[in-house]
């Protein structure tokens, strides 16, 4: 068997390439409990951003119980950036629950919202998710911030 010696810079470059190829996707889900009997008020979540270069995919995440029976949901989503800019939009999203088993009492619904988002400022982003009409069976609502590969 032959010993192969690598130049230290070449070895470091190979190690970096392997780390980049095998990196774990960062996934941060931030949720707030809501009134399960009648969700009408905003669920407010806060996300601390310290990376202004990574692209992220955002999904609305709902934790629901068996009382939830909607097939779609109308939401007002309002975002405030660290430099106080505000953006509000109304969206209607498909949001049917997919129950993992007959005995499951709760499940999560993840609804794609935005792809390839770059947070240009470091600091705290505040997202408010408000249903346009009363929703029954939602226990918590929030956003999944997932780094895009």
Please tell me what each predicted stretch does.
Residues 18-21:
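C-terminal motif of bacterial Sec signal peptides marking the signal peptidase cleavage site
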Residues 23-26:
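Bacterial signal peptide processing site
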Residues 53-60, 116-133:
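Noncatalytic modules at the cell exterior or secretory-pathway interfaces
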Residues 66-67, 109-119, 131-140:
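Short acidic/polar inter-strand loop motif in beta-rich domains
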Residues 89-120:
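An anionic, turn-rich surface loop/hairpin at beta-sheet edges
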């Amino acid at each position: 068997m032959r010993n192969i010696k690598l130049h230290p810079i070449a070895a470091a470059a190979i190690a970096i390439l392997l780390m980049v190829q095998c990196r774990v996707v960062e996934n941060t889900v931030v949720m707030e409990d809501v009134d399960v009997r009648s969700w009408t008020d905003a669920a407010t979540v806060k996300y601390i951003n310290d990376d202004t270069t990574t692209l992220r995919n955002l999904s609305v995440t709902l934790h629901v119980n068996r009382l939830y029976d909607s097939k779609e949901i109308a939401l007002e989503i309002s975002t405030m950036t660290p430099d106080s800019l505000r953006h509000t939009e109304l969206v209607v999203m498909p949001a049917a629950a997919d129950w993992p088993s007959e005995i499951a009492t709760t499940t999560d619904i993840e609804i794609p919202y935005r792809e390839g988002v770059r947070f240009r400022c470091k600091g705290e982003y505040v997202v408010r998710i408000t249903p346009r009409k009363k929703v029954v069976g939602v226990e918590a609502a929030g956003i999944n911030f997932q780094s895009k590969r």
